[in-house]
Design a protein with these regions (language model features):
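Calcium-coordinating acidic loop motifs
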Residues: 3, 170-172
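Single conserved hydrophobic/aromatic residue that forms the stacking wall/gate
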Residues: 1-11
Length: 220
C-alpha cells in the first residue's frame, strides 16, 4: 500500500510492497519463505507468496533501484518471513485505525475484552517545542481480572497523539489478538516512520504479546 520509502531503513522479518533505493534492500532475503497478509472486501487472509524483484531505471531525484511486488499487491498489507503460519482467512478487527490521546480502542475476542489505551507519562520543553511522552498499553479483561502490558513509550511533538493501528486480529491462530501498529523510531521518534508486529503466541509468561518484527523508514 506504500510505494515510496525513505532513505535509511531497518528491516527485520517483514517487508512492504513498494520501491527501494540502492543499499536499502538485501536481495538475499528473497531466498526465504514469505507470507502475505491481505485484506479485501472486509476479509483478511494470509497466504504464501513469491516475491518479485524488478530493477528500476534510476530516478534523477530519488534513485530508486528495486521494486518489490507480489500477486494481488494492491490488497497486500504486509509481508512476513520467519513465522510459522498457515494459509487461511483470519478473524480481524480493524485496519488503519488512528489511536488518539485519552482514547481507548476496544474490541471483543473470545473470552477476552481487549483494548489499547494511552497515558501521558512526561512533558518536556525542548526549546520552543513541547514533547509529550505517552505510554501505550495493551489490556486483556476476563472474568473481572484486568491484565495490562506497556507496549512502548511514544514521544509526541505535536499537540495531539496520533498512532496508526495498521491491523489487529488473530494472525498466529492462538485465539488471542495480534497487532501491527506504529511504533517510535529510534532514538526519540524525531523523524521517519516505524511499525511493529506484536504476536501473542511469542509472548513470555509475564507478557501478553511480544514484538517479533519491525520496519523502520527514516530520512528525507
Amino acid at each position: 500500500r506504500t510505494s515510496r520509502r525513505q532513505r535509511q531503513m531497518c528491516i527485520r522479518d517483514r517487508l512492504y510492497v513498494g520501491d527501494y533505493k540502492k543499499g536499502e534492500l538485501d536481495v538475499k532475503i528473497f531466498n526465504r519463505e514469505w507470507w502475505g497478509l491481505f485484506e479485501q472486501d472486509n476479509i483478511s487472509y494470509i497466504r504464501k507468496v513469491t516475491l518479485r524483484l524488478d530493477k528500476l531505471e534510476p530516478d534523477i531525484q530519488y534513485d530508486w533501484q528495486y521494486r518489490v511486488s507480489v500477486d494481488d499487491y494492491k490488497n497486500c498489507i504486509i509481508l512476513f518471513t520467519g513465522l510459522d503460519l498457515t494459509e487461511r482467512e483470519i478473524n480481524y478487527f480493524t485496519d488503519n485505525h488512528i489511536i488518539r490521546n485519552n482514547e481507548d480502542f476496544t474490541f471483543e475476542f473470545g473470552p477476552y475484552h481487549t483494548f489499547l489505551n494511552s497515558e501521558l507519562k512526561k512533558t518536556e520543553s525542548i526549546g520552543e517545542i513541547l514533547r509529550r511522552d505517552y505510554s501505550i498499553y495493551l489490556n486483556y479483561k476476563s472474568n473481572k481480572k484486568l491484565t495490562t502490558q506497556e507496549l512502548f513509550l511514544f514521544p509526541c511533538y505535536g499537540e495531539e497523539l496520533l498512532i496508526s493501528l495498521i491491523w489487529a486480529g488473530d494472525l498466529d491462530n492462538d485465539g488471542k489478538t495480534d497487532f501491527i501498529i506504529q511504533i517510535p523510531t529510534p532514538p526519540n521518534n524525531e523523524m521517519g516512520d516505524s511499525s511493529g508486529l506484536f504476536l501473542s503466541s511469542k509472548a513470555d509468561s509475564e507478557e501478553l504479546v511480544k514484538l517479533v518484527a519491525y520496519f523502520i523508514s527514516t530520512g528525507c
